[in-house]
Each structure stands twice: as C-alpha cells, then as structure tokens.
Amino acid sequence: MQAGKYLPRHAAKLAETVAYLQALEAPGKRQLVVWPVHCVLGTWGHNIHQGLGEAIARWEMHTGLTCNKVLKGQNPMTEQYSAFRAEVPRVDDARTALNQDLLVQLAAGADRLLVAGEASSHCVAASVEDMLGALPNQRLKRTVLLTDCMSPVTGFEGLAEALVLQSLAHGLGAMAIGELPV
C-alpha cells in the first residue's frame, strides 16, 4: 500500500489505513490477510452450526441456563480474530477493546471450559492466546481444546499445530470430543 500498488476504496482513508497496517504488522502481530467476504451477520457463515445449535438448546433446556453468545468483528476498520479483542483496538469503539467482562466470566465459570470453532489457525488461536495471557493457571488447567471441532485455513496448518503445542505447554488439554469424560 505504501508503494501505491494498492489503495483503500476511499482515498480519504489512506493515512488511517497505512497507520493501521503498520500497527497490525508490528513485531509479534499478524500480517494482513485479504479474506473473501465471510461470516457476515445474517448469513450461514455467521450462524452457529445447526447440530451445535441444537445441542446448545438441549443443554439450555436441561440446565435452565442460557449460553452466552459473544459477537465479534463488528467494526469493519479492524481485524478481530480473537473473541476477546481486535488485533488493533480502536479508541473510538469500545467493542474492539479487550472484553474484560468475558474474561471474568470465563475465569469464574464452569468446571471445564471447552474450546472449539473456526478456524484453529486464526480465530481460535488468537482467542486462546488472549486466554493464556489473561486467565489464571487453575482455569487454564480446566480448559480443553476439542481438536476435532476445529480446523485450520488451508495453507496455515502450521499455525494450528502451534496452537495445540502452545496450549499443552500452558496446561490446557487437547482431545477429540468423543474422548471427553461425561
């Protein structure tokens, strides 16, 4: 973009876009990936998979509790892989800041925290990285990655493998859903 090969759709956003890309690609951050349009509110890609949705509904009926569904990626001016924060939080949008309320709920929550979702190489990995930095060790040791309930973006399998190794090193479990004790 700095060389002028690519430009934002709105020329007035050039300086903001360049600053954003520099912050996004700062050491330890991610490189910009231009994704196809996906997970748009109101489309199947944004919805909970039907089988999982039915299982959640049964659990809610059985327990009388409500599953907390968290929206992310609501600001089109920043990437938000993690369920907890945007890659580059915006000062003009609190929804992009670290979701402390969600972290507090998870820290004090159920006996076991199960992690699943798409994609293990990006969104799940970013969410777990945020959990590793924010949740107490006793909570992390009661957290399990459901390895057959997630998959990587093609070409990024190494990031998904790194997620599992990093999680195990921090005391999280990793197993297939059929291996879960009842």
List each language-model region with its residue ranges.
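Active-site-adjacent betaalpha module
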Residues: M1-V182
